Amino acid sequence: MRAVLCGYYGMGNGGDEALLAALLQMLPARVVPVVLSGNPKETSDRHQVEAIPRKSLSAVVSALRRSDAFIWGGGSLMQDASSALNPAYYGGLMLLAQIMGLKTIAWAQGIGPLNQPFSQWLTRRALANCDGVSVRDRNSAALLHQWQRTCLLAPDPVWGLDYAPVEGLWDLPAPRVAVALRPHPQLTPQRLKTLAQALASFQKATGVCLLLVPFQPTKDLAIAQFIANHLTEQRSGPHHIYSLTQPQQLKGLFRGVEMTIGMRFHALVMAAAEGCRCFAVSYDPKVDAIAQNLSLPGWTLSPLASETSGNVSFLPPFPADSPTLCKTWLDFYANGDALSPDQIQSQTDRAFMHQDLLSETLFPP
């Protein structure tokens, strides 16, 4: 059996590359994957799979004609918060695959935000005709329940991704705290400056080594460099920028970290899975969702983020002054807890329910 895997792959985003790695890890051995990628050569070399250009309609249609199944491979594909084109692209391909008679799976999805009526209609239509659907958060499951679409609810598959060691990590000073930020309109220049000041104060008070982790370097590296420059100016302590391209190494990085401050959804997943204390800075309902599900402390950059997720008061607003940020982090660093081994094992075991969905849908008993 051949299956076309469709996601935000080959775009340099560590979280989506981790989803692809987890999908390939969980895919039944009898399935030959064909990956739609923004960088087919890189995807092919990294994962030893066939990869084709995601924007080449002729190549995509040819791949569908040669395949038996089509899989939305994890993440928040059907959302129009970043671009109205996302639902059109992913939803259009799903409908095309269904018209062509392929078996279709929406795998480990986070649905929404869907602000436009067309996005809502297209998502509902595409999901209605899928042979199997799994989602990674309760809000997505609740939406599908409203649409009378049955689905499997399980933690993000990256909980189950294998980790790999990171060369040189253990040579860095300890203890270590990771910071994984991303650009967003709500992370204004003033807020970023406040955050950098708070990190410098936090580092001076604790003596930690700060690891700045750009999950999508083309977008996140500038923020990491801004913070690194501020830490250098303040002479607050050792820091290191880690731009890792291997998803398993990205996850392995958090094995050597005591605490993570994360905007990136998969930074929080990976850190929590590796027994690290996590502090969320939310810009999106998916970050609100994991913070609520794991009872993580944190702040929301925008009240709209919590309202959209239905948890208006779960995360308090981002503070306006650096002393408040620093004090909150110091309290959490001193007194906060990571997930227990039993909690981590439970999340990991349940994440493999996505693997069961693949096997049962592609090869029904």
Spans of model-derived segments:
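Active-site anion-handling motifs in enzyme catalytic cores
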Residues: M1-P365
